[in-house]
UniProtKB/Swiss-Prot annotation:
This is Valine--tRNA ligase. GO terms for molecular function: aminoacyl-tRNA deacylase activity; ATP binding; valine-tRNA ligase activity. GO terms for cellular component: cytosol. It holds the Pfam family Val_tRNA-synt_C. Keywords: Aminoacyl-tRNA synthetase, ATP-binding, Coiled coil, Cytoplasm, Ligase, Nucleotide-binding, Protein biosynthesis. A motif ('HIGH' region) lies at residues 42-52. Transmembrane segments: none annotated. Residues 849-873 form a coiled coil. SUPFAM superfamilies: Anticodon-binding domain of a subclass of class I aminoacyl-tRNA synthetases, Nucleotidylyl transferase, tRNA-binding arm, ValRS/IleRS/LeuRS editing domain. InterPro entries: aa-tRNA-synth_I_CS, aa-tRNA-synth_Ia, Anticodon_Ia_Val, M/V/L/I-tRNA-synth_anticd-bd, Rossmann-like_a/b/a_fold, tRNA-bd_arm, tRNAsynth_Ia_anticodon-bd, Val-tRNA_synth_C_sf. The keyword Oxidoreductase does not apply. PROSITE patterns: AA_TRNA_LIGASE_I (PS00178).
Length: 882
């Protein structure tokens, strides 16, 4: 066994060995209970980040522990085609190669996209391997696999037939850069410093030949404030609150869109906030979701003044062809020149940015395919029996379902699931095969989340409900995901599963938080504060990263990355290595069949602690409390096992102190403990525990073992050992407080009225003398010498020390304290005397200040006198003083 822990040597090729020996393969013929986790599919767009590493490691720990409990586990891998993200990445790569997407056919582009997928899928697999994930690659899935694509298109057809899918105009998040609709989860909102532009809309009956900038005239106009003046070309009305007295006379009249001949009405609606801005708002239904709803109530048209790429269209008149922001700049300049402009104010507001292109999102009216969700959500609310961890997220989930809006499921992309809809004029047919040559296939693909919503059951053989995987492993046992996509993904999986399979997709949902830097900022590419998990692994090893990720945040809470804690994780693993090495060097057997009747008190206590620890850990796994499990295991390994038991074990393993029977029994016991500890830690740190386990079991790999059951529980022995520990700890503290040299031996007696305790202590006598650092220790049921005095009491135990020795120690301590206080007081007395004997001080200082110094001097003198009197009396630390 290597002297030092070297994670590179430990982890090198170990995962490949696991794969070659098929350790991760599910066994449908095992006649065991099944446990299944389907991995949340990462986007096939590049490197995994710390969030992926955290999420995957949590699942891996759960899978490995369930396997050690005897379950037939399946951790199913897979990846998401990530429609818009992948298409954008491929476009960037082609651009670097001198190819523009607009010059390529859809077929050629998709050929490049599939090449991209194959390259990056392999990168993700390699990162999974680095993390040590217990994945069965025989069942790996990709959301664009032919069978999954078939399922998706069939589901679309079924939902269309049930009139749950329809086609209509909707205001959607539009990315002008990628020219597609985005889901809400693909939009990042940032506080942005913008402008609020105040613009005049003149009444139609205002004389058009007047000079609008003439201050002598009082023009009749309404003033609005907007952050997006360039959208005014699509305005359909101005709107005021019907209860606002300022604008009652304007309701029903018409105004001109500034610098145009286009007339729009002034309407009233309670939607307008009287106290915000001027109390007048422009209504632009084609470019604002709230205005679109207003338009429905007031029968207004919805027009667009922008093209799909964010440039202005013909409605913008002379600004046609300009980028929206260039148009804004030139339009404001013109409005100022012509008297339509009042002022500009700085305005901090939230602006949506595309997570794909980082372009500012444009709310846009667009013809899209939409899924009705309200009825499905109500069914899900009534029937789902999913357990949420933490429980508080159940309310968030239910509230979302209660207020859910219809879902825009179409995207204007090439890469994705083709919508199986065919058009001929105004006719639409939804089917996979073409109805005939005169029919054209719909240009759109489905939102990535549509296929992801089918992931828990589409990967298990559905819609073939007789498929063995589906029959035996659906619903899956637990979904582990971030709370940030609870509403975007989890909710969709739930209502799709209940609608299509009449079952919940999973039994439990475990939600974790976000990964943040040590300043509390969310890690992201745009902020440049991200950490590559592969770089962490290269420095500290996979096991250290896994331990850090899963023991530093409770379920539902964010994880704050701190490299010093990763280093501490490495230190813990290094400690485990040294512990294992000690056990290996001091044992000459692999047997674990020790005789319980030969165990010492410390061994009985440790075996009881192991039993209780295993029970606690098993219970906590049911609640997915990995942080708490890590805390318990850390304490048990470092404190209970290493700091205490191994110190006693050194005596048990000393051939000069033990008979051969006890020696061999102690060795077997130690090997048993070591194997069990490695098993408990294995789900968290699989590489090092596998390497160490090989030293104690040459037949079975740790990944294939079942966690040993513990039944021995001697609470009396544990209590006695805890009492003994407390005596030892208190003795050490008293040595320290009394400045007793740790090398100074003391004659002690340990007394107890209980014979069983005394017998255990007799067996430990030599070890106790080492711990107490005494010349001689006597174990008795009563004080054997009247000159002994009690020093410490711990429940059923009493510790005695020679009275003379204790007095001497107390006197030494007292003398030290006396001299320290004496020197301090003399120093202060001398300082005060010097000041009070200084003529300059007495002449110049205020009388109050002189008086204060005199009182100080008197106080110091009194304290000094009292100290001398106490010295002449007896030692106050003398325990016999009455």
């Amino acid at each position: 066994m290597q002297t030092k822990y070297d994670f590179k040597k430990v982890e090198h090729q170990r995962y490949q060995q696991w794969l070659e020996k098929k350790y991760f393969c599910a066994n449908p013929n095992a006649n065991k209970k099944t446990f299944t986790v389907v991995i949340p599919p990462p986007n096939v767009t590049g490197k995994l980040h710390l969030g992926h590493a955290w999420n995957n490691t949590i699942q891996d720990i759960i899978i490995r522990f369930k396997k050690m409990q005897g379950f037939d586990v399946l951790f199913l891998p897979g990846m998401d085609h990530a429609g818009i993200a992948t298409q954008n990445k491929v476009k960037e790569q082609l651009k670097q190669e001198g190819l523009l997407t607009k010059t390529l056919s859809k077929e050629i582009f998709l050929k490049y996209a599939w090449q991209w997928k194959e390259e990056h899928a392999q990168n993700i697999r390699q990162q999974w391997q680095v993390l040590g994930l217990h994945l069965d690659y025989n069942f790996e899935k990709f959301t664009l696999d032919p069978d999954l694509s078939q399922q998706v298109q069939e589901v679309f057809g079924k939902l269309f037939q049930k009139k749950l899918i329809y086609r209509d105009y909707k205001i959607i998040n539009w990315d002008p850069e990628t020219k597609t609709a985005l889901s809400n989860v693909e939009v990042n909102y940032h506080e942005t410093e913008g402008k609020l532009y105040y613009i005049k809309y003149f009444l139609v009956d205002f004389p058009t030949n007047s000079n609008l900038s003439d201050a002598s005239l009082v023009p009749s106009f309404l003033e609005i404030a907007t952050t997006r003046p360039e959208t005014m070309f699509a305005d359909q009305a101005l709107m005021v609150n019907p209860n606002d007295p300022r604008y009652q006379s304007f309701i029903g009249k018409k105004v001109f869109i500034p610098d145009t001949n286009i007339q729009i009405p002034v309407i009233s609606d309670n939607y307008v906030d009287i106290n915000f801005g001027t109390g007048v708002v422009k209504v632009t239904p084609g470019h604002d979701i709230n205005d679109f709803e207003v338009a429905k109530r007031h029968q207004l048209k919805a027009l667009l003044c922008m093209n799909e790429d964010g440039t202005m269209n013909d409605l913008a008149l002379q600004y046609q062809g300009l980028d929206r922001f260039v148009c804004r700049q030139k339009l404001v300049q013109t409005l100022k020149q012509k008297g339509f402009f009042t002022k500009t104010e700085n305005h901090l507001h939230k602006v949506g940015y595309s997570s794909i292109s980082d372009a500012i999102i444009e709310p846009r009216l667009s013809l899209q395919w939409v899924l009705k969700t309200k009825a499905i959500a109500q069914i899900a609310l009534k029937t789902n029996k999913i357990n949420f961890f933490p429980l508080r997220f159940e309310n968030i989930f239910n509230n979302w379902l209660q207020n859910i809006e219809d879902w825009c499921i179409s995207r204007q992309l090439w890469w994705g699931h083709q919508i199986p809809a065919w058009h001929k004029g105004q006719e639409i047919k939804v089917q996979i095969e073409s109805p005939g040559p005169e029919w054209s296939l719909d240009c759109d693909v489905l939102d990535t989340w549509f296929s992801s919503a089918l992931w828990p059951f589409s990967t298990l053989g559905w819609p073939n409900c007789n498929a063995p995987l589906f029959q035996n492993r659906f619903p899956t046992d637990v979904l582990v995901t971030g709370y940030d996509i609870l509403t975007f993904w989890v909710s969709k999986m739930v209502f799709q599963s209940i609608l299509l399979t009449h079952k919940d997709p999973f039994k439990d949902v475990l939600l974790h938080g976000l990964v943040r830097d040590n300043k509390g900022q969310k890690m992201s590419k745009s902020k440049g504060n991200g950490v590559d998990p592969l770089e962490v692994v290269a420095k500290y090893g996979t096991d250290a990263l896994r331990w850090f990720l899963t023991t530093n945040a409770a379920p539902g809470f964010d994880l704050f990355y701190d490299e010093t804690k990763v280093a501490s994780s490495w230190n813990f693993i290094n400690k485990l290595w040294n512990i294992s090495r000690f056990v290996k060097l001091n044992t000459s057997t692999l047997d674990t069949d020790f005789d319980i009747n030969l165990l010492t008190l410390t061994q009985k206590a440790l075996l009881t602690q192991l039993h209780l620890t295993t029970q606690k850990v098993t219970t906590l796994y049911q609640k997915y409390e990995l942080k708490e499990i890590g805390k318990i295991l850390y304490h048990f390994v470092w404190e209970d096992f290493a700091n205490w038991h191994l110190e006693f074990a050194k005596h048990d393993l000393d051939q000069n102190n033990s008979n051969l029977t006890n020696l061999h029994n102690s060795q077997k016991f130690l090997v048993y403990m070591m194997k069990h500890i490695l098993q408990l830690l294995h789900p968290f740190i699989p590489f090092v525990t596998d390497a160490l386990y090989e030293n104690f079991d040459n037949k079975t790999n740790i990944t294939q073992t079942t966690l040993q059951k513990t039944s021995y529980c001697n609470l009396d022995a544990l209590a006695d050992f805890e009492n003994l520990k407390n005596l030892i700890i208190k003795t050490r503290h008293l040595r320290q407080e009394s400045n007793i040299n740790c090398k100074l031996n003391l004659e002690l007696e340990v007394a107890s009225q209980f014979s069983t305790i005394l017998q255990d202590f007799v067996n430990l006598q030599q070890a106790l003398e080492k711990f107490f650092k005494t010349l001689q220790i006597k174990i008795t049921n009563k004080v054997t010498n009247s000159k002994k005095t009690i020093w410490l009491i711990e429940k059923n135990l009493s510790l005695y020390i020679d009275r003379k020795t204790l007095n001497e120690l107390n006197e030494t301590k007292f003398e030290s304290n006396f001299l320290q206080q004496k020197n301090t007081l003399l120093k202060e007395i001398k300082r005060s005397e010097t000041i009070l004997n200084n003529p300059s001080f007495l002449q110049k200082a205020a009388s109050a200040k002189i008086e204060i110094e005199k009182k100080k001097y008197e106080s110091y003198c009194k304290q000094y006198k009292k100290l001398l009197e106490s010295k002449n009396n007896s030692n106050p630390l003398n325990p016999n003083k009455k």
